[in-house]
Design a protein with these regions (language model features):
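Short, small-residue-biased leader/transition segments that mark boundaries at the very start
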Residues: 1-6
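Alpha-helical scaffolding segments of alpha/beta enzyme cores, especially the outer helices
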Residues: 13-20, 24, 53
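Flexible, acidic glycine-rich loops studded with aromatic residues
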Residues: 28-45, 49-181
């Protein structure tokens, strides 16, 4: 136990040094939610990738939080189980799942610490920009609507109509989006 505490203290101190270093130049430090478990400066942003429980814990410690749950916003996961899908890292996050994301249960004061939603695309299997676009679109539309709209309950059928129009607009700059199912 003693050595574990020493490692946690050193990790926290190192994190604080980095946060102070970037803050002096006017930037904010952002750490993955594992680092948010350390008792660190409340100005350090926590990127909550492991889910709403970790996001809520970071908020309750006073950290600003960016929601990036791997269960909904990891766009390097498959969009469909169809065998025609390009190779992905694993997992399955279809469009409906992105659209259906529920924010963590927080008080209004706690919710003010949530600074936004973010999708991540890790590119180990995505060897060109066309594949990155394919994995992002149309899921990025669902994420954007979830982030910027307060309609509840959300109407997936209505969203799909809006998404179809948006995908038409993306054809002009030749974005390689996945078609709607």
């Amino acid at each position: 136990v003693g050595s574990e505490m020493c490692i946690r203290d050193r990790s926290r101190d190192f994190l604080q040094q980095i946060a102070d270093y970037v803050r002096k130049d006017g930037y904010d430090a952002i750490v993955w939610d594992e680092a948010g478990e350390l008792e660190a400066d409340k100005h350090i942003f926590v990127m909550a990738w492991r889910g709403n429980d970790f996001a809520a814990a970071a908020v309750r410690k006073g950290h600003p939080v960016i929601l990036a749950p791997c269960s909904h916003f990891y766009f390097d996961y498959y969009q469909s189980s169809a065998p025609t899908e390009p190779k992905a890292i694993g997992g399955l996050i279809p469009l409906r799942q992105v659209y259906g994301y529920e924010l963590p249960e927080l008080s209004p004061e706690e919710a003010s610490k949530v600074r936004g939603l973010q999708a991540n695309i890790w590119t180990e299997y995505l060897y060109d920009m066309g594949l990155v676009e394919y994995m992002a679109w149309p899921r990025a539309l669902a994420l954007a609507e979830r982030a910027w709209s307060d309609c509840d309950p959300r109407d997936y059928k209505s969203f799909r109509s809006r998404a179809a129009l948006a995908l038409k607009l993306l054809e002009h700059p030749a974005v390689n989006s996945r078609p709607l199912d």
